[in-house]
């Protein structure tokens, strides 16, 4: 089925991993389509949301109606903020877990994004036939683009160019406070205040806002209107020439122009402002003749600046499909050569050729991939009812080096349901909601640390610790927990270690340190002047300092090596929660690194370790390997078949 949203890519190739499911879910309808190849969007169907108890039911109905086989990858644009795994629609009664939905439908990948974020990603690919320019201005290539759209609400987003790709902004800008520009709009604001304590732009220039404007103008003119008049009625009356309806539409478009101008100057949207949503296209020529563009440019000293920025009305029939397709394609391409999808597909292809025991591991991986990722080998073997060597043989049959390699490939493909932004916990959240947000925020912070951690600095820190004569761990307040944990791990290496959480003890001990000694200083803020003075004394005597802290802090700048763990908890007034987890993770990385160094076949190191561990009656290499296993990152002994 050809649509306005279908691109004209000639002879587009089929997706190697099968058709992809695309969805655009609004408060009233859920639209579905299949993308068989890049830009080839077919089988578009629309389902009323009220007819299905859950989103999963609606998707299953579509897949049944479309008469297709397996779908591996799916992406959904939804008219709702997406802030973690749990999604509760504000303008519909659907509530769901992204991960639970993925499992229920058997998808390898399920992305759920805000509908205006998806629409924003479609903008660079729109042709002249899929948009109409309103007024003058010339868009500047590779510049920021703004997007707004009145529908049930007032959606807002933007696109920022970054090298050869675009970054979409998630935004709730429609909730910015409405500011009237003339006496008529003052009257509208006063009328709206009777109903809403906070009157946002969304209240007056989304679809329902036209009704508020209409009723405010009717009250001004002392006209009686029917109680059931809605936006569709007002638009119909305006097209028929009704004076009050025409004035309401004119006022609506003027307010929309003000908001569009605000968005343009806020984003610096020299690439243009695009208008989507379901309301404006229904206005037709009424919008073209409206004061929208004049109000857009009416920014006083910035009038010339706004005059150069073009405004466009999106006319493509299903533009959200284009955007959500682009987001899904980028997500899949960012994975390690598509390794995750290849693993799932290879499991399915090889399943019948596997032994019955290996087949049980395959079924566990397909149906419960996160269990494979998170569980140790002993639990995986127990859940699949096989031996541990069977699990290893299964992994190697897929071309993986072992269980760790298999877990990595599997995990890479499942990050689509893990939010990479901080989710706010709100009063009234249920335990399910706030529990998921706390876990999601922590997982997100760890994944971002993995992406941005300077591993050259990690290697340097491990070398310093491995060669240290003595290691002291300093942490004040909440950071003392991390220091004590580090001491507990590192004393197993036979290196003299101690942890101090008291500033006076730190000062007294640091004064005795010298060349060959190391201080690991853990601090969220990295700014405590007393701690900095203590470290200066030790460094002047020849000791080295490894800092686990935020970037660009005085501590990070002073340290011999800085391991930077930036995160959302940047205000010193906030209790360290995520930061503490990141600091503990850094200690684990350093401990595992030192264990690996000490297990290496180095004669001089082995001799030193042997002397240090003579009391335990174990060789240095064996002891270091034991410590690695003790740290839960070694290989457990294999059970026999």
From Swiss-Prot:
Report the transmembrane regions from the record: 576-596
Where in or outside the cell? Answer: Membrane
State the GO CC annotations: cytosol; membrane
Residues forming the HTH rpiR-type domain are 341-417
**Which EC class is the enzyme in?**
transferase
Keyword DNA-binding present in the record's keywords: the answer is yes
Q: EC number(s) on record?
A: 2.7.1.2
- The protein's name is Bifunctional protein glk
